């Protein structure tokens, strides 16, 4: 696993719009969609967004989200949390993950 390196929030926003927005929101108080609202995700344990129905796998994983484990998760979500209902296949390019996480850090705080 490689260490997270801050990327381009602008490129990350574009990635979010094309790869994530169909299932997630980021604004405070935003609705859950197919996936949970991601506001406040960094520093929160997996499976803990209030009002969202997670799989047991997400709850039991109990990972405290930070930039590094988020990058590992986004590489291959179903490998990182077997049993997750996240259908997204992952972002294979480290640069894309860094850009997306940089955007999420700003958009979700």
Curated annotation (Swiss-Prot):
Q: How is it modified after translation?
A: Methylation may enhance its transport into mitochondria. Methylation occurs in fungi, plants, and some protozoa, but not in animals. The precise role of methylation at Lys-79 is unknown, but it seems to preclude pro-apoptotic activity, possibly by lowering affinity for APAF1.
Query: Which chain positions lie within coiled-coil regions?
Result: none
- Taking the first listed entry, what is the main subcellular location of this protein, grouped into a coarse class? mitochondrion
Q: Which residues carry this modification: N6,N6,N6-trimethyllysine?
A: 78-79
The record's subcellular location field reads:
Mitochondrion intermembrane space
Which positions bind heme c?
Answer: 20, 23-24, 86
List membrane-spanning regions: none
What is the induction note for this entry? By oxygen at the level of transcription. Expression drops rapidly when the oxygen concentration falls below 0.5 uM O(2).
Q: Which GO terms describe its molecular function?
A: cardiolipin binding; electron transfer activity; heme binding; metal ion binding
Q: Does the keyword Repeat apply?
A: no
Gene Ontology cellular-component terms for this entry are: mitochondrial intermembrane space; mitochondrion
Q: Which GO terms describe its biological process?
A: mitochondrial electron transport, cytochrome c to oxygen; mitochondrial electron transport, ubiquinol to cytochrome c
Q: What is its cofactor?
A: heme c
Which domain of life does the protein's organism represent?
A: Eukaryota
User: What note does UniProt attach to the cofactor annotation?
Assistant: Binds 1 heme c group covalently per subunit.
Which keywords does this Swiss-Prot/TrEMBL entry list?
Answer: Electron transport, Heme, Iron, Metal-binding, Methylation, Mitochondrion, Respiratory chain, Transport
Record carries keyword Cell membrane? no
Give the family this protein belongs to, as stated in its UniProt record. Belongs to the cytochrome c family.
**What function does this protein fulfil?**
Electron carrier protein. The oxidized form of the cytochrome c heme group can accept an electron from the heme group of the cytochrome c1 subunit of ubiquinol-cytochrome c oxidoreductase. Cytochrome c then transfers this electron to the dinuclear copper A center (CU(A)) of the COX2 subunit of cytochrome oxidase, the final protein carrier in the mitochondrial electron-transport chain. Isoform 1 (CYC1) is the predominant cytochrome c during aerobic/normoxic growth.
Q: Note on file?
A: Present with 7330 molecules/cell in log phase SD medium.
Kindly provide the name given to this protein in its UniProt entry.
Cytochrome c isoform 1
Native organism: Saccharomyces cerevisiae (strain ATCC 204508 / S288c)
Lineage of source species: Eukaryota, Fungi, Dikarya, Ascomycota, Saccharomycotina
Q: Gene encoding this polypeptide?
A: CYC1
């Amino acid at each position: 696993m490689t260490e997270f390196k801050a990327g381009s929030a602008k490129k990350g926003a574009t990635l979010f719009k094309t790869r994530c927005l169909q299932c997630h929101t980021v604004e405070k108080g935003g609705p859950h969609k197919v996936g949970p609202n991601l506001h406040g995700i960094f520093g929160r344990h997996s499976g803990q967004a209030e009002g969202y129905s997670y799989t047991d796998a997400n709850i039991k994983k109990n990972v405290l989200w930070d930039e590094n484990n988020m990058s590992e998760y986004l590489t291959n979500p179903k490998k990182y949390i077997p049993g997750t209902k996240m259908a997204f296949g992952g972002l294979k390019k480290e640069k894309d993950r860094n850009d997306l996480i940089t955007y999420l850090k700003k958009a979700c705080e």
